[in-house]
């Protein structure tokens, strides 16, 4: 069967060789305002939108996620579990003509899998790249992006509740003592959240989201040059 590769609103016929994968986390507390699967929903939104704008294939989501041992705000897997899931997606992607894989990651802990990307390239003879788009956990940026895509319950009462760091220690990781002690960047972000709190800024959310989508689109363009 000869496929009409030039049909539709696509950048170039070569874009059919690019597959976009969303990576995040399904089981993490995000305060009172955001759902436990915030990271994967944001990653999926960005990845799918970029696929629509470019014509690249959206290959779906990775279900496992991982995290640094000292960050305790959810239920996670080993980095190897993500690696094995990616092996499955890449193997199936190759069957439909994908030669270049772009992972859109919106969960900081998943950075731990970067060490496996070269192994995947070598095993399957493909290109594998990852874009990391991360925010201070459940803080202003993530709440604002979540609101824009429709997953945040950001009324005044919920936001006030969200800023109760004793009840929701994961917000900004303010109350995650072990994480703050082991990671200077986390501690600095937590201090900022303690000082300024968490607020909703729709304009900020739109800008962050649009910039993230543009970043993925630009990477797809680079991959088909």
Swiss-Prot record:
It catalyses: 2-amino-5-formylamino-6-(5-phospho-D-ribosylamino)pyrimidin-4(3H)-one + H2O = 2,5-diamino-6-(1-D-ribosylamino)pyrimidin-4(3H)-one 5'-phosphate + formate + H(+). Keywords: Hydrolase, Iron, Metal-binding, Zinc. InterPro entries: Creatininase-like_sf (IPR024087), Creatininase/forma_Hydrolase (IPR003785), FAPy_deformylase (IPR024901). Signal peptide: none annotated. One of its GO terms (biological process) is riboflavin biosynthetic process. It comes from the Archaea. Requires one Fe(2+) ion for activity. Catalyzes the hydrolysis of the formamide of 2-amino-5-formylamino-6-ribosylamino-4(3H)-pyrimidinone 5'-monophosphate (FAPy) to form 2,5-diamino-6-ribosylamino-4(3H)-pyrimidinone 5'-phosphate (APy). Homodimer. This is 2-amino-5-formylamino-6-ribosylaminopyrimidin-4(3H)-one 5'-monophosphate deformylase. It comes from Methanocaldococcus fervens (strain DSM 4213 / JCM 15782 / AG86) (Methanococcus fervens).
